[in-house]
Amino acid sequence: HDAVRPLVSQRILNDVIEALKDHRAIDVAIPSADTIIEVDDKGYISSIPDRSKLRRGQTPQAFDRQLIADAYERALKDPQFKTTDDCGVVRKYSDEPVFVVRGEESNMKLTYREDTYMLDKLFQLKNTEPQDISHVGDIFRDKVAVVFGGSYGIGKNIVEMLEQSGARVFSYSRTENHIDVGQREDVARALTEAHEQAGRIDYVICTAGVLNKEPLTTMDYATIQAAVQTNYLGTVNVALEAHPYLKQTEGKLIFFTSSSYTRGRAFYSIYSSTKAAIVNFVQAVAQEWDGDGIKINCINPERTKTPMRQKNFGIEPDDTLLMPERVAEATLRTLVSDCTGQVIDVRRKVEN
């Protein structure tokens, strides 16, 4: 059951495999944040070990095949054989030292019923860092991208960066060419136009969204409807209309959420709730469309310097905000990745 660690990260797996190049036995462990005590038969503390030297074991473990085979061969001949894991077998029945790779607190084990509830919540909040794109070369050259919300802010930076990378980009927005993602027929018309002119569509990116910072009770109902129409139904419309084109190319679909998706915030309840809905939608549709070869992910930038933010929050110091160019770069990184159904965090680089 110790192998049931559904949140094991790719970093841990990579580090374990890399360690096998120099070591024949590998364990994964993390420091103990709690004091560990040893208790005697009567229930009293008999010793308090120095926790700086203690680690909590995790998985995976990895071994040279012949090493662990020989260790188990000896163990099974021992009538007193008793162990809790493979590293214990190797330590007891061989002279090979076991190298320890750093684990992660989130790499928790599913053992008790209560663990399922905690893991389910962690799965909901699971996010991913965008991968490096320095090695991708001309991967965007001759690709065709459609960007909704490409006239300003993050969308405009994505358009510019894709064009600089050699892609053919079609940009649509209400201000640019009267395309409203809240209207399904507008989305259909835009995608049809792009496909007729380019012959294919490889990427569809939707950055379109509206934010109204206002108490719910003072919001005009038409404003509420418009926000839901653009932020959430716009996402649904883009996904539905993009599906047949992206199925042909096994393409990529990108939407945008907000850091407020994990917890609603006062004075922008509609915005926060639609952003939470987008995450849930992306996770669900990623599963539905996996067989079609379509990768769908969600970019989650922290507070970003955009016209929409400035309109609602005024002028803020640049060093407290993420620049839209960094979000655009993270979006391109996500386009070249194989992940799907993920929330991609984009954070400021904080200098020490």
Language-model segments: what does each one mean?
Residues 151, 159:
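N-terminal Rossmann NAD(P)H-binding glycine-rich loop of SDR-like oxidoreductase domains
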Residues 215-216, 220-225:
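Substrate-binding pocket helix/loop in short-chain dehydrogenase/reductase
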Residues 7-99:
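Conserved core of the sugar-phosphate nucleotidyltransferase
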Residues 263, 284-294:
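Active-site-adjacent segment of SDR/Rossmann-fold oxidoreductases
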Residues 207-213:
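Conserved NAD(P)H cofactor-binding loop of Rossmann-fold oxidoreductase domains
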Residues 239, 274:
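Active-site helix of classical SDR
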Residues 298, 315-352:
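C-terminal helical subdomain
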